[in-house]
């Protein structure tokens, strides 16, 4: 399973505090069979400043290989966002380390 975590624009050790789709980049991890998460890449988000349904389609394409999206929050100005509720986890504006710990707890539950 692949996981994308929204990264803060100024501090790559923190989750981006705004809507998931506005994050400037994502840490892409592969979850192993025993729950370990291995960083595969840092992926830039060229659509961070875009808005609307067209952006949603572009975001789905950008993260088409990702199974679970992790961010501080999802949706913007009444929109539920580009991704189904089942495919995302809200963690709040926490450290990357805290977000990873929550994912590990979730996978062992």
Regions from the language model: what does each represent?
Residues 58-87:
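Mid-chain, well-packed structural core segment of small domains
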Residues 1-57, 65, 88-109:
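Non-catalytic interface/targeting segments
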């Amino acid at each position: 399973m692949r996981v994308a975590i929204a990264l803060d624009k100024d501090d790559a050790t923190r989750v981006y505090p705004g809507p998931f789709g506005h994050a400037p980049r994502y840490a892409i991890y592969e979850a192993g069979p025993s729950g370990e998460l291995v960083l595969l890449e840092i992926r830039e988000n060229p659509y961070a400043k875009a808005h609307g349904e067209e952006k949603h389609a572009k975001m789905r394409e950008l993260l088409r290989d990702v199974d679970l999206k992790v961010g501080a929050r999802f949706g913007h100005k009444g929109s539920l966002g580009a991704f189904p509720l089942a495919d995302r986890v809200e963690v709040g504006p926490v450290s990357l380390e805290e977000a990873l710990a929550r994912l590990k707890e979730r996978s062992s539950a």
